[in-house]
Design a protein with these regions (language model features):
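Surface loop/turn motifs at the tips and blade-to-blade linkers of beta-strand repeat domains
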Residues: 2-3
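Serine-hydrolase catalytic core recognition
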Residues: 7-200
Length: 200
């Protein structure tokens, strides 16, 4: 597809047609009907009204980066969301949001707007990190947590938090971590093991 971002396809029963769904961090979902030969038949939904509405607001953008893992060699995929009025000469509180569960993926160039946007509007920097054990990085990366679930992921999250806390625009005394389900377990583990970096 010509658009960079997250793509998925839903095929008709006969496989003569498919709907391509594409989005990226700056573009809401676009649904396009294609023939099996790859020729676009028509756009079903382009979310033009939503795009136009968003232009009325100052929306914080996701910045995709890589952060060193605890092993010192692996780079972890991450995104940062800074306040719209970000000033590099200031230091901001940081909240890391993560799930970190086996074969999951939270860092992707796909559309989504949730409460993290509100935090950025309120002067927080938000980071999302996929540690080792998560998906879309190959078999070795995904399976390295086998029989030691929670160890490598928490080590990576603590290392990433320390790296971020070392950036001049982060207030190293105000670094928090949050997650749900497996991410809640990870948050608790990181607070216990990494209490020298996490304050909440």
């Amino acid at each position: 597809t010509p658009t960079k971002g997250w793509n998925e396809a839903e095929f008709s029963k006969s496989f003569k047609y498919y709907i391509n769904i594409v989005s990226n961090a700056d573009m809401p979902h676009v649904y396009t009907l294609y023939a099996a030969n790859g020729k676009a038949v028509r756009t079903l939904e382009d979310n033009a009204a939503l795009k136009a509405k968003l232009e009325d607001y100052a929306v914080a953008k996701k910045e995709f980066i890589q952060i060193p893992a605890a092993d010192g060699t692996t780079l972890l995929n991450a995104w940062l969301m800074k306040p719209v009025n970000f000033d590099a000469s200031k230091s901001y509180p940081l909240l890391i949001v993560q799930y970190s569960g086996p074969n999951s993926q939270q860092v992707s160039n796909s559309w989504g707007m949730d409460w993290t946007q509100y935090l950025a509007q309120e002067g927080y920097i938000v980071a999302c990190i996929d540690p080792r054990g998560t998906a879309a990085r190959g078999e070795e990366f995904r399976k390295c947590t086998y029989m030691q679930l929670g160890k490598i992921e928490s080590d990576d999250m603590i290392a990433a938090a320390k790296w971020l806390a070392g950036q001049s625009y982060i207030d190293a005394k105000k670094v928090g971590i949050w997650g749900w389900s497996f991410g809640g377990f990870m948050s608790s583990l990181c607070l216990m093991k990494g209490n020298d970096v996490f304050s909440t």
